[in-house]
């Protein structure tokens, strides 16, 4: 299967900082999927590094400048994952989808970060999945699925096991577009998932759920056209 993962920067690089074991466990999961014969792409987010830098820069700069800072953080996190993947990856972070596809065609795990301002790496992962005709997009993030309301501010929010892309558009449509924002799925990504009719799974970004999203029995939300 041809699978694109959006790996939240905050799961790869939690608030407490980088941990060798944590990065290694993600690298192992992606290597395992490659060994099983899957074609694997990983789009890495900017996490806390991006958010810390953006919150200071915002005092001086406009949103697209802050986005550019966020993009640099996504590429730095990408380099960290690439370092742990060793010979299974290429020591370069592509900045567009054509260069990304060349890496996949070299039979390597593709790792990339952001591309242009005004969206998050969710939108990058959805566009990459469309561009390479992937079979599955997996959004591995800091929540365990899509809820009917934002679970961070609604105690009675309910996790949805299965939704369609139109329902995803309704749920995510009102999320913020400002630099560093962190809704469960970026609204632009939802639009791309809908237009490209991409089968998508949103799971908690832990190695076990990343593996289960491809092999079955994950605990997240499945989104179908
Ligand atoms: N960002 C972009 N374009 C991209 C990827 C990221 O502008 O293609 C910026 C956004 O401000 C985003 C931040 O919130 O970098 C960190 O990425 P993410 O962790 O939110 O995906």
From Swiss-Prot:
EC number: 2.7.4.22
Catalytic activity: UMP + ATP = UDP + ADP
An individual GO BP term: UDP biosynthetic process
Subcellular location per the Swiss-Prot or TrEMBL entry: Cytoplasm
Record: residues binding ATP: 9-10, 47, 51, 141-142, 147, 150
Paired cysteines (S-S): none
Regulation: Inhibited by UTP.
Pathway: Pyrimidine metabolism; CTP biosynthesis via de novo pathway; UDP from UMP (UMPK route): step 1/1
Keywords carried by this UniProt record: ATP-binding, Cytoplasm, Kinase, Nucleotide-binding, Pyrimidine biosynthesis, Transferase
TM annotation in the entry: none
Annotated UMP binding sites: 46, 67, 115-121
EC class (word): transferase
Predominant location: cytoplasm
Record family assignment: Belongs to the UMP kinase family.
Protein name: Uridylate kinase
Biological source species: Methanococcus maripaludis (strain DSM 14266 / JCM 13030 / NBRC 101832 / S2 / LL)
Gene that encodes it: pyrH
């Amino acid at each position: 299967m041809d699978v694109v993962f959006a790996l939240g920067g905050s799961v790869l690089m939690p608030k407490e900082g980088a941990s060798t074991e944590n990065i290694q466990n993600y690298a192992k999961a992606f290597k395992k999927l490659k060994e099983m014969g899957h074609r694997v792409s990983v789009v890495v987010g900017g996490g806390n590094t991006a958010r810390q830098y953006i919150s200071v820069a915002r005092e001086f700069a406009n949103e697209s400048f802050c986005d550019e800072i966020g993009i640099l953080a996504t590429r730095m996190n990408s380099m960290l994952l690439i370092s742990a993947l060793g010979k299974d990856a290429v020591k370069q972070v592509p900045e567009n989808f054509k260069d990304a596809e060349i890496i996949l065609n070299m039979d390597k795990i593709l790792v990339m970060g952001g591309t242009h301002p005004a969206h998050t790496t969710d939108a990058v992962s959805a566009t990459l999945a469309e561009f390479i005709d992937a079979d599955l997009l997996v959004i591995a993030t800091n929540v365990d699925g899509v809820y009917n309301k934002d679970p961070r501010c609604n105690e009675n929010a309910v996790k949805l096991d299965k939704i369609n892309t139109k329902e995803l558009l309704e749920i995510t449509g009102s999320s913020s577009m400002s630099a560093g924002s962190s809704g469960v799925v970026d609204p632009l990504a939802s639009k791309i998932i809908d237009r490209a009719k991409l089968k998508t799974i949103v799971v908690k970004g832990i190695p076990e759920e990343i593996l289960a999203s491809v092999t079955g029995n994950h605990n997240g939300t499945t989104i179908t056209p």
